[in-house]
Design a protein with these regions (language model features):
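Glycine-rich, flexible loop/turn motifs
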Residues: 15-16, 69, 107, 111
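Short secondary-structure boundary/hinge segments and terminal tails
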Residues: 6, 72-74, 111-115
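Secondary-structure end/capping motifs
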Residues: 21-102
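Short beta-strand->loop
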Residues: 1-8
Length: 123
């Protein structure tokens, strides 16, 4: 749909500071993110095969439903912390304007660049 080109869907991975400070856990997050980005890149490039496998065989949806779902989705985009901040700031500013936040928040406080290299290397 047109709205997906205007404001794409957003996904974030959250980790508590104590998890990021643990070298073993940070290494596990790094491995997970690398695999997740590669899988997303593949599903973007192979939408028909992904839809057949996931929506038709795994979810057991009919072809029409699977097609409708897939046509409503935007491609997965994998951004570094700095690349994601402007979109996140717009979302927070929208929530502030709607009265859902008590004060303005700064998006730069929501991100760490710890995993930027793994995202960049795998996208």
């Amino acid at each position: 749909p047109q709205e997906r080109t205007l404001l794409p869907s957003t996904s974030y991975f959250y980790a508590r500071p104590e998890v990021l400070a643990d070298a073993q856990k940070a290494k596990a997050i790094e491995a997970f993110l690398a695999a997740f980005v590669r899988a997303g890149k593949w599903s973007n490039a192979n939408a028909q095969a992904w839809g057949e496998h996931y929506y038709r065989r795994f979810q057991k949806l009919d072809a029409e439903s699977a097609s409708a779902i897939q046509s409503s989705l935007s491609p997965l985009i994998f951004q570094t912390a700095g690349e994601a901040q402007p979109h996140h700031q717009r979302l927070m500013d929208t929530l502030l304007a709607a009265g859902s936040l008590p004060r303005r928040l700064d998006a730069k406080d929501s991100f760490v660049s710890t995993f930027d290299a793994v995202v960049t290397a795998n996208r």
